[in-house]
Amino acid sequence: MPGVLLDRAALIARVKDHVSRELPPEAIRDEGLALQLFGFIPTKFDYEAAEYALLQDQLAGYYEPADGTMYMAGDLGDEEAEATLAHELVHALQDQRWNLQERSKYRPGEGDHSEVVSALAEGDATSAMFDVMIARAAPGTGKTAVDLPDDVFAEQIRAGMNDGPGAGAPHVMRTSLAAPYIYGTLFVHALRRRGGWDAVNRAWDDPPTTTEQILHLDKWLAREPAMAVTAPTFAALGAGWKVADEDSEGELGARIAFEEWMEPKAAADASGGWGGDRGVLVTSGDKAAFAWRVRYDAGKTKDDRAARAYATVTRGLDKTLGPAKVSDPAFVCRERADRGPFALARAGADVVFALGPVSTSASGWASAGDCAQSRKWVRELVGAR
Protein backbone atom coordinates (compact mmCIF):
# COMPACT_ATOMS: atom_id res chain seq x y z
CA MET A 1 0.00 0.00 0.00
CA PRO A 2 1.50 3.37 -0.99
CA GLY A 3 1.95 6.06 1.64
CA VAL A 4 2.29 9.82 1.25
CA LEU A 5 3.48 12.37 3.82
CA LEU A 6 1.75 15.75 3.63
CA ASP A 7 1.73 18.97 5.61
CA ARG A 8 -1.48 19.68 7.53
CA ALA A 9 -2.92 22.03 4.91
CA ALA A 10 -2.35 19.51 2.11
CA LEU A 11 -3.81 16.72 4.25
CA ILE A 12 -6.99 18.70 4.84
CA ALA A 13 -7.12 19.57 1.13
CA ARG A 14 -7.16 15.83 0.42
CA VAL A 15 -9.97 15.35 2.92
CA LYS A 16 -11.96 18.19 1.34
CA ASP A 17 -11.53 16.58 -2.06
CA HIS A 18 -12.76 13.26 -0.65
CA VAL A 19 -15.79 14.90 0.98
CA SER A 20 -16.68 16.83 -2.20
CA ARG A 21 -16.78 13.55 -4.11
CA GLU A 22 -18.70 11.58 -1.50
CA LEU A 23 -21.08 14.08 0.09
CA PRO A 24 -23.45 16.58 -1.57
CA PRO A 25 -22.84 20.14 -0.32
CA GLU A 26 -26.43 20.52 0.84
CA ALA A 27 -25.94 17.64 3.31
CA ILE A 28 -23.32 19.63 5.23
CA ARG A 29 -25.36 22.82 4.98
CA ASP A 30 -28.53 21.15 6.25
CA GLU A 31 -26.70 19.50 9.14
CA GLY A 32 -25.37 22.87 10.24
CA LEU A 33 -28.81 24.47 9.89
CA ALA A 34 -30.39 21.83 12.14
CA LEU A 35 -27.70 22.42 14.78
CA GLN A 36 -28.38 26.15 14.59
CA LEU A 37 -32.11 25.60 15.08
CA PHE A 38 -31.38 23.57 18.20
CA GLY A 39 -29.13 26.37 19.44
CA PHE A 40 -26.02 24.18 19.51
CA ILE A 41 -23.94 26.44 17.25
CA PRO A 42 -24.14 30.22 16.61
CA THR A 43 -26.44 31.62 13.94
CA LYS A 44 -23.56 33.50 12.30
CA PHE A 45 -21.27 30.54 11.85
CA ASP A 46 -19.54 28.81 8.94
CA TYR A 47 -20.22 25.24 9.96
CA GLU A 48 -18.32 23.61 7.10
CA ALA A 49 -15.20 25.73 7.66
CA ALA A 50 -15.34 25.00 11.39
CA GLU A 51 -15.56 21.26 10.72
CA TYR A 52 -12.43 21.34 8.60
CA ALA A 53 -10.60 23.50 11.14
CA LEU A 54 -11.42 20.97 13.85
CA LEU A 55 -10.28 18.12 11.63
CA GLN A 56 -7.04 19.90 10.80
CA ASP A 57 -6.29 20.11 14.52
CA GLN A 58 -7.12 16.45 15.18
CA LEU A 59 -6.28 14.57 11.99
CA ALA A 60 -2.97 12.72 11.87
CA GLY A 61 -3.67 10.70 8.75
CA TYR A 62 -6.29 8.83 6.78
CA TYR A 63 -6.67 5.93 4.40
CA GLU A 64 -8.27 6.80 1.05
CA PRO A 65 -10.20 3.81 -0.30
CA ALA A 66 -10.57 5.43 -3.73
CA ASP A 67 -6.86 5.12 -4.50
CA GLY A 68 -5.74 2.68 -1.80
CA THR A 69 -3.27 5.20 -0.40
CA MET A 70 -2.44 6.16 3.17
CA TYR A 71 -1.94 9.89 3.72
CA MET A 72 -0.17 11.00 6.90
CA ALA A 73 0.81 14.31 8.42
CA GLY A 74 4.51 14.90 7.98
CA ASP A 75 5.01 16.58 11.36
CA LEU A 76 4.29 13.53 13.54
CA GLY A 77 6.79 12.26 16.09
CA ASP A 78 7.88 8.62 16.01
CA GLU A 79 5.31 7.35 18.53
CA GLU A 80 2.40 9.24 16.98
CA ALA A 81 3.45 8.15 13.49
CA GLU A 82 3.59 4.50 14.59
CA ALA A 83 0.14 4.74 16.18
CA THR A 84 -1.32 6.48 13.13
CA LEU A 85 0.21 3.89 10.82
CA ALA A 86 -1.35 1.07 12.85
CA HIS A 87 -4.75 2.78 12.81
CA GLU A 88 -4.80 3.45 9.08
CA LEU A 89 -3.47 0.00 8.19
CA VAL A 90 -6.53 -1.45 9.91
CA HIS A 91 -8.75 0.72 7.70
CA ALA A 92 -6.90 -0.61 4.65
CA LEU A 93 -7.54 -4.18 5.81
CA GLN A 94 -11.21 -3.36 6.46
CA ASP A 95 -11.48 -2.09 2.91
CA GLN A 96 -9.81 -5.17 1.44
CA ARG A 97 -11.93 -7.66 3.35
CA TRP A 98 -15.28 -5.91 3.86
CA ASN A 99 -15.29 -3.18 1.19
CA LEU A 100 -15.15 -0.21 3.53
CA GLN A 101 -15.47 2.16 0.58
CA GLU A 102 -18.88 0.77 -0.37
CA ARG A 103 -20.09 0.58 3.22
CA SER A 104 -19.05 4.18 3.87
CA LYS A 105 -20.94 5.68 0.93
CA TYR A 106 -23.32 8.51 1.74
CA ARG A 107 -26.92 7.32 1.80
CA PRO A 108 -29.55 10.05 2.23
CA GLY A 109 -31.87 9.46 5.16
CA GLU A 110 -29.63 6.82 6.76
CA GLY A 111 -27.63 8.93 9.20
CA ASP A 112 -27.82 6.42 12.03
CA HIS A 113 -26.56 3.66 9.75
CA SER A 114 -23.66 5.88 8.65
CA GLU A 115 -22.73 6.37 12.29
CA VAL A 116 -22.77 2.59 12.77
CA VAL A 117 -20.28 2.10 9.93
CA SER A 118 -18.06 4.86 11.29
CA ALA A 119 -18.20 3.50 14.84
CA LEU A 120 -17.33 -0.05 13.82
CA ALA A 121 -14.51 1.08 11.53
CA GLU A 122 -13.00 3.57 13.98
CA GLY A 123 -13.53 1.31 16.98
CA ASP A 124 -11.75 -1.58 15.27
CA ALA A 125 -8.83 0.63 14.19
CA THR A 126 -8.56 2.49 17.49
CA SER A 127 -8.54 -0.71 19.54
CA ALA A 128 -5.71 -2.11 17.42
CA MET A 129 -3.85 1.20 17.64
CA PHE A 130 -4.05 1.14 21.44
CA ASP A 131 -2.62 -2.39 21.40
CA VAL A 132 0.41 -1.02 19.57
CA MET A 133 0.73 1.96 21.90
CA ILE A 134 0.50 -0.19 25.04
CA ALA A 135 3.01 -2.73 23.68
CA ARG A 136 5.44 0.12 23.08
CA ALA A 137 4.87 1.76 26.47
CA ALA A 138 4.82 -1.47 28.52
CA PRO A 139 6.69 -4.17 26.59
CA GLY A 140 6.53 -7.69 27.95
CA THR A 141 3.49 -7.10 30.16
CA GLY A 142 1.06 -8.82 27.82
CA LYS A 143 -1.43 -6.02 28.35
CA THR A 144 -3.69 -4.90 25.51
CA ALA A 145 -6.28 -2.22 24.91
CA VAL A 146 -9.03 -4.28 26.52
CA ASP A 147 -7.19 -4.06 29.86
CA LEU A 148 -7.94 -0.34 29.96
CA PRO A 149 -11.05 0.45 32.02
CA ASP A 150 -13.76 1.80 29.72
CA ASP A 151 -14.06 5.11 31.57
CA VAL A 152 -10.29 5.67 31.45
CA PHE A 153 -10.19 5.00 27.72
CA ALA A 154 -13.16 7.28 27.02
CA GLU A 155 -11.64 10.09 29.04
CA GLN A 156 -8.38 9.82 27.09
CA ILE A 157 -10.24 10.34 23.81
CA ARG A 158 -12.30 13.21 25.20
CA ALA A 159 -9.19 14.89 26.58
CA GLY A 160 -7.60 14.74 23.15
CA MET A 161 -10.61 16.52 21.65
CA ASN A 162 -10.65 19.18 24.36
CA ASP A 163 -6.99 20.20 24.08
CA GLY A 164 -5.26 22.36 21.49
CA PRO A 165 -6.84 24.75 18.97
CA GLY A 166 -9.85 22.46 18.51
CA ALA A 167 -10.95 23.11 22.08
CA GLY A 168 -12.57 26.33 20.87
CA ALA A 169 -15.01 24.50 18.58
CA PRO A 170 -18.63 24.21 19.77
CA HIS A 171 -19.11 21.38 22.24
CA VAL A 172 -21.52 19.48 19.99
CA MET A 173 -18.94 19.37 17.19
CA ARG A 174 -16.24 18.00 19.48
CA THR A 175 -18.50 15.34 20.99
CA SER A 176 -19.78 14.32 17.55
CA LEU A 177 -16.24 13.92 16.23
CA ALA A 178 -15.17 11.88 19.26
CA ALA A 179 -18.30 9.68 19.41
CA PRO A 180 -17.43 6.96 16.86
CA TYR A 181 -13.96 6.59 18.35
CA ILE A 182 -15.25 6.30 21.91
CA TYR A 183 -18.38 4.21 21.51
CA GLY A 184 -17.10 2.22 18.55
CA THR A 185 -14.01 1.21 20.52
CA LEU A 186 -16.04 0.32 23.62
CA PHE A 187 -18.20 -1.91 21.39
CA VAL A 188 -15.09 -3.56 19.93
CA HIS A 189 -13.57 -4.01 23.39
CA ALA A 190 -16.75 -5.70 24.60
CA LEU A 191 -16.52 -8.08 21.64
CA ARG A 192 -12.82 -8.79 22.22
CA ARG A 193 -13.49 -9.61 25.88
CA ARG A 194 -16.11 -12.13 24.77
CA GLY A 195 -14.32 -13.75 21.86
CA GLY A 196 -11.14 -11.97 20.84
CA TRP A 197 -10.57 -10.53 17.39
CA ASP A 198 -12.65 -13.34 15.86
CA ALA A 199 -15.69 -11.81 17.54
CA VAL A 200 -14.85 -8.44 15.96
CA ASN A 201 -14.59 -10.09 12.54
CA ARG A 202 -18.01 -11.65 13.07
CA ALA A 203 -19.40 -8.19 13.76
CA TRP A 204 -18.07 -7.06 10.39
CA ASP A 205 -19.68 -10.09 8.74
CA ASP A 206 -23.02 -9.39 10.46
CA PRO A 207 -22.77 -5.73 11.46
CA PRO A 208 -24.94 -3.73 13.83
CA THR A 209 -27.81 -1.90 12.16
CA THR A 210 -28.30 0.93 14.69
CA THR A 211 -26.14 2.93 17.06
CA GLU A 212 -28.35 1.51 19.81
CA GLN A 213 -26.68 -1.83 19.02
CA ILE A 214 -23.25 -0.16 19.17
CA LEU A 215 -24.02 1.34 22.58
CA HIS A 216 -25.61 -1.83 23.99
CA LEU A 217 -23.95 -5.09 22.97
CA ASP A 218 -26.97 -7.10 24.11
CA LYS A 219 -29.11 -5.26 21.54
CA TRP A 220 -26.79 -6.41 18.77
CA LEU A 221 -26.65 -9.96 20.11
CA ALA A 222 -30.46 -9.97 20.08
CA ARG A 223 -30.49 -8.28 16.63
CA GLU A 224 -33.08 -5.83 17.95
CA PRO A 225 -34.19 -3.67 14.99
CA ALA A 226 -35.17 -0.04 15.05
CA MET A 227 -38.86 0.76 15.19
CA ALA A 228 -40.36 2.24 12.04
CA VAL A 229 -41.10 5.90 12.74
CA THR A 230 -42.93 8.11 10.25
CA ALA A 231 -41.37 11.41 9.26
CA PRO A 232 -42.87 14.47 10.94
CA THR A 233 -45.36 16.44 8.87
CA PHE A 234 -45.56 20.23 8.75
CA ALA A 235 -48.93 21.40 7.43
CA ALA A 236 -49.32 23.63 10.51
CA LEU A 237 -46.53 25.85 9.19
CA GLY A 238 -48.67 26.88 6.23
CA ALA A 239 -48.24 26.70 2.47
CA GLY A 240 -44.95 26.87 0.62
CA TRP A 241 -42.83 24.66 2.86
CA LYS A 242 -40.81 21.76 1.46
CA VAL A 243 -38.53 19.05 2.84
CA ALA A 244 -34.82 19.92 2.72
CA ASP A 245 -33.65 16.83 4.61
CA GLU A 246 -35.10 13.80 6.37
CA ASP A 247 -33.01 11.52 8.55
CA SER A 248 -32.64 9.33 11.62
CA GLU A 249 -30.23 10.37 14.37
CA GLY A 250 -30.27 7.12 16.34
CA GLU A 251 -29.68 6.64 20.04
CA LEU A 252 -26.16 8.02 19.71
CA GLY A 253 -27.45 11.17 18.01
CA ALA A 254 -30.02 11.60 20.77
CA ARG A 255 -27.35 11.16 23.44
CA ILE A 256 -25.08 13.75 21.80
CA ALA A 257 -27.97 16.23 21.56
CA PHE A 258 -29.07 15.69 25.15
CA GLU A 259 -25.51 16.25 26.40
CA GLU A 260 -25.92 19.88 25.33
CA TRP A 261 -28.49 20.27 28.12
CA MET A 262 -27.31 17.90 30.84
CA GLU A 263 -24.45 15.81 32.19
CA PRO A 264 -23.37 12.79 30.09
CA LYS A 265 -24.83 10.20 32.48
CA ALA A 266 -28.22 11.90 32.48
CA ALA A 267 -28.06 12.15 28.67
CA ALA A 268 -27.27 8.44 28.43
CA ASP A 269 -30.23 7.65 30.68
CA ALA A 270 -32.58 9.94 28.73
CA SER A 271 -31.59 8.47 25.36
CA GLY A 272 -31.52 4.87 26.65
CA GLY A 273 -34.63 3.00 25.65
CA TRP A 274 -34.53 4.63 22.21
CA GLY A 275 -36.59 2.58 19.82
CA GLY A 276 -36.50 4.67 16.65
CA ASP A 277 -36.63 8.24 15.42
CA ARG A 278 -37.15 10.43 12.40
CA GLY A 279 -36.39 14.09 11.87
CA VAL A 280 -37.26 16.49 9.08
CA LEU A 281 -35.75 19.86 8.15
CA VAL A 282 -38.12 22.02 6.12
CA THR A 283 -37.61 25.35 4.36
CA SER A 284 -39.67 28.06 2.71
CA GLY A 285 -37.56 30.74 1.06
CA ASP A 286 -35.17 31.93 3.75
CA LYS A 287 -37.26 30.40 6.54
CA ALA A 288 -36.43 27.09 8.20
CA ALA A 289 -37.90 24.74 10.80
CA PHE A 290 -37.09 21.31 12.18
CA ALA A 291 -39.18 18.56 13.78
CA TRP A 292 -37.87 15.40 15.41
CA ARG A 293 -39.88 12.44 16.69
CA VAL A 294 -38.10 10.04 19.08
CA ARG A 295 -39.95 6.83 19.93
CA TYR A 296 -39.07 4.84 23.05
CA ASP A 297 -39.23 1.14 23.81
CA ALA A 298 -41.69 0.01 26.45
CA GLY A 299 -40.38 -0.31 29.99
CA LYS A 300 -42.44 -1.42 32.95
CA THR A 301 -45.34 0.19 31.11
CA LYS A 302 -45.72 1.08 27.43
CA ASP A 303 -44.90 4.75 27.90
CA ASP A 304 -42.79 5.04 31.05
CA ARG A 305 -39.41 5.36 29.30
CA ALA A 306 -40.71 8.19 27.13
CA ALA A 307 -42.21 9.86 30.20
CA ARG A 308 -38.89 9.70 32.06
CA ALA A 309 -36.97 10.99 29.04
CA TYR A 310 -39.41 13.86 28.60
CA ALA A 311 -39.08 14.84 32.25
CA THR A 312 -35.27 14.66 32.12
CA VAL A 313 -35.00 16.72 28.94
CA THR A 314 -37.48 19.25 30.31
CA ARG A 315 -35.31 19.73 33.40
CA GLY A 316 -32.22 20.05 31.23
CA LEU A 317 -33.85 22.71 29.09
CA ASP A 318 -35.00 24.61 32.19
CA LYS A 319 -31.44 24.61 33.50
CA THR A 320 -29.84 25.54 30.18
CA LEU A 321 -32.36 27.85 28.54
CA GLY A 322 -34.32 29.15 31.51
CA PRO A 323 -38.05 28.96 32.26
CA ALA A 324 -40.46 28.08 29.46
CA LYS A 325 -43.04 30.57 28.23
CA VAL A 326 -45.64 27.80 28.12
CA SER A 327 -45.42 24.80 30.45
CA ASP A 328 -48.09 22.10 30.46
CA PRO A 329 -47.72 18.49 31.68
CA ALA A 330 -46.95 17.23 28.15
CA PHE A 331 -45.96 20.42 26.29
CA VAL A 332 -43.36 23.10 26.97
CA CYS A 333 -42.36 25.93 24.68
CA ARG A 334 -39.86 28.78 24.64
CA GLU A 335 -39.86 31.71 22.26
CA ARG A 336 -36.40 32.67 21.01
CA ALA A 337 -35.95 36.00 19.25
CA ASP A 338 -33.17 34.81 16.96
CA ARG A 339 -34.08 31.14 16.38
CA GLY A 340 -37.84 30.90 16.64
CA PRO A 341 -39.88 28.85 19.11
CA PHE A 342 -38.50 25.70 20.74
CA ALA A 343 -41.27 23.25 21.67
CA LEU A 344 -40.98 19.87 23.39
CA ALA A 345 -43.90 17.50 23.85
CA ARG A 346 -44.75 13.93 24.75
CA ALA A 347 -47.55 11.73 23.46
CA GLY A 348 -47.54 8.09 24.48
CA ALA A 349 -44.14 6.57 23.69
CA ASP A 350 -43.07 9.54 21.56
CA VAL A 351 -41.04 12.60 22.55
CA VAL A 352 -41.35 15.33 19.94
CA PHE A 353 -39.25 18.43 19.24
CA ALA A 354 -40.54 21.31 17.08
CA LEU A 355 -38.00 24.06 16.35
CA GLY A 356 -38.76 27.26 14.46
CA PRO A 357 -39.88 28.61 12.11
CA VAL A 358 -37.11 31.17 11.86
CA SER A 359 -36.02 33.60 9.16
CA THR A 360 -32.38 33.01 8.23
CA SER A 361 -31.80 36.10 6.08
CA ALA A 362 -28.26 37.37 5.59
CA SER A 363 -29.07 40.49 7.59
CA GLY A 364 -29.71 38.38 10.69
CA TRP A 365 -31.83 35.57 12.03
CA ALA A 366 -35.27 36.41 13.46
CA SER A 367 -38.15 34.36 14.79
CA ALA A 368 -40.94 33.69 12.32
CA GLY A 369 -43.32 31.95 14.71
CA ASP A 370 -44.58 31.69 18.28
CA CYS A 371 -45.62 29.08 20.82
CA ALA A 372 -49.24 29.18 19.67
CA GLN A 373 -48.15 28.02 16.23
CA SER A 374 -45.81 25.45 17.81
CA ARG A 375 -48.70 23.98 19.79
CA LYS A 376 -50.66 23.54 16.55
CA TRP A 377 -47.64 21.93 14.93
CA VAL A 378 -47.14 19.56 17.85
CA ARG A 379 -50.81 18.58 17.77
CA GLU A 380 -50.34 17.73 14.10
CA LEU A 381 -47.22 15.71 14.89
CA VAL A 382 -48.69 13.66 17.72
CA GLY A 383 -51.84 13.08 15.71
CA ALA A 384 -49.86 11.60 12.81
CA ARG A 385 -47.82 8.96 14.60
Describe the function of each predicted region.
Residues M1-S20, P108-D112, T144-E155, D206-T210:
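Acidic helix-start/capping segments at beta-turn-to-alpha-helix junctions
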Residues A10-E26, D46-D67:
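Catalytic zinc-binding patch centered on the HExxH motif and its immediate surroundings
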Residues H18, Y62, A73, A92-Q96, ...:
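Structured segments of extracytoplasmic/periplasmic soluble domains
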Residues G68-A86, H113-V117:
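Short pre-active-site segment immediately N-terminal to the catalytic Zn-binding motif
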Residues A83-L100, A125-T126, V188, A298:
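Active-site recognition of the HExxH zinc-binding catalytic motif
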Residues D95-Q101, K105-A154:
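Post-HExxH zinc-binding segment in Zn-dependent metallohydrolases
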Residues M161-D286:
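Pan-zinc metallopeptidase signature
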Residues A270, G275-R385:
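C-terminal soluble interaction/assembly domains
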